[in-house]
Amino acid sequence: MNNIKKNKAFSTFEIILSILIFSFLMNIAFVKYREFKELRDINEAKTKITEAFYLVSTTSLKQKTKQELQLDLSAKKIIISNKSLKIQEIQLPKDLIYYHTYTSNLKKLKLSFTENGNISKSFSIYIFNKAKKVRYKVSFYGFDRSKFLKINNYRKKKNNEITYSNIDEYHKTTNEDREAFYMDWRKE
């Protein structure tokens, strides 16, 4: 009788231990899945933003016409248009947060591309995760002399956390101090 109680207690302990181990492994798997999904969304956003700007730039250059691109960061979409005609709408990943440095905190931005395929003012788009920590930066540079739009992509290094609340000040500081910028970012 005593032997049966020991086996029953041992079985209950084994079941509880198995459940705890399974729960722990599921928790790790869930965290890794979220990290994978975030990385996938960031790569998708970076690719869509870069391709949209290149498309408008090359179309403008080939057709020798002014093209427009609307960046709606609150709706998380890019609208490409030719004069008043809407050509294409690109949806950005919804789980990410976007910030641009073109003007002060406007969520809707309308950019005009010249006949040479350039933008009038250089600026950057920062991509943040759900926790409002910056993960990526896409910078746009227009050069009238060379007649092309240059786009640089930067991945955030893991050394310094930059949040959505301090990105404006951070951007101004690192534009003046490029050495500090390259401590935090890796060009791709």
PLM segments and residue spans:
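Membrane-proximal N-terminal amphipathic helix
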Residues: E35-K66
